[in-house]
Regions:
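ATP-dependent helicase/translocase motor core
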Residues: 2-194, 203, 207-218, 237, ...
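Short alpha-helical segments and helix-capping/turn motifs at coil-helix boundaries
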Residues: 21-27, 226-230, 254
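Short beta-strand-centered segment that lines the nucleotide-binding/catalytic pocket of NTP-utilizing
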Residues: 197-199
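Conserved helicase motor
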Residues: 202, 222-232, 246-251
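Conserved RecA-like ASCE ATPase "motif II neighborhood" in helicase/translocase motors
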Residues: 239-260
Length: 260
């Protein structure tokens, strides 16, 4: 972490990032790519993150909660209205032991093969909105069971594919907190047999298929389904994640009806 504060006339967006880009020796072992999960520039109002230090070419992304459908963070009124730093969620929520363990287990991923040049690989660390939406979705499903409807809004370039991918993988491993909730087969059985990802464009379908397959650490659990026979085959063969397009959705419905 590179910590800055307004009382010394510095902030994370300019001074924190500038220090990482210009003043840090990226040949030091700790700062070399792959040694740290994430680097963050933090002040009392905003947080920025990167997973790869590359000198002046280092690219930072916001790790903020957003404020009134815009950038930044909302005012922190505190639990008793006493106020606090806008970025307190970072240490109060994200950096707890339970949260970090969850991030390492379910979110962080180094793509590519161990045979590939390390500098050509990509280290994925979730942005705040991705972390929040996947956790909220999984926790709500585990609490209230199947049959729920959700609306998740992502702006262009905000990582929809990764959010969908993380959600899909975690939903197939979601267990109900109670045997009494809808869809539960007992607290020792996953709540969902299969997750079906439906996209509205063929290009996005291809991107998602590649993204989901790349994230998979277990072979043969992901399958495309372009017609009902493929869906039937995928379900019968125990595929955990099935990907298709909205144009093929009527076939999906027919296939599910036939299986039931």
């Amino acid at each position: 972490l590179e910590l800055k504060n307004a009382w010394t006339g510095q902030n994370a967006k300019y001074h924190g990032q500038k220090q990482y880009k210009n003043d840090r020796d990226i040949t030091q072992p700790l700062l070399q790519f792959g040694r740290c999960l994430v680097h963050m520039a933090v002040d009392t109002d905003e947080v920025y993150m990167t997973t790869k230090l590359a000198g002046k070419n280092t690219f930072f992304l916001p790790f903020n909660k957003g404020n009134n459908h815009g950038q930044g963070n909302p005012p922190n009124t505190g639990t008793m209205g006493e106020g606090g730093h806008k970025t307190s969620y970072l240490w109060q929520e994200v950096f707890t032991k339970e949260s970090l363990a969850n991030i390492i287990q379910h979110f962080v991923r180094l793509d590519g093969s161990s045979k590939d040049d390390l500098n050509k690989r990509t280290l994925f660390f979730p942005r705040y909105h991705q972390l929040s939406v996947v956790r909220n979705l999984v926790n709500h499903a585990a609490t209230y069971g199947v049959g729920q409807t959700y609306l998740i809004q992502h702006s262009a370039g905000s990582g929809k594919s990764n959010s969908i991918t993380w959600a899909a993988y975690q939903l197939i491993e979601t267990y109900p907190i109670s045997a009494d909730i809808p869809g539960s087969k007992g607290i020792e059985q996953p709540l969902f047999d299969t997750v079906i990802v439906v996209t509205d464009r063929r290009l996005l379908d291809k991107q998602l298929r590649e993204n989901i397959k790349e994230f998979s650490e277990v072979k043969n659990i992901v399958a495309p389904a372009f017609k009902s026979s493929e869906l039937k085959s995928a379900l019968e063969n125990g595929k955990k994640i099935i990907i298709t397009t909205i144009q093929k959705f009527p076939f999906i419905i027919d296939g599910i009806g036939d299986l039931s």
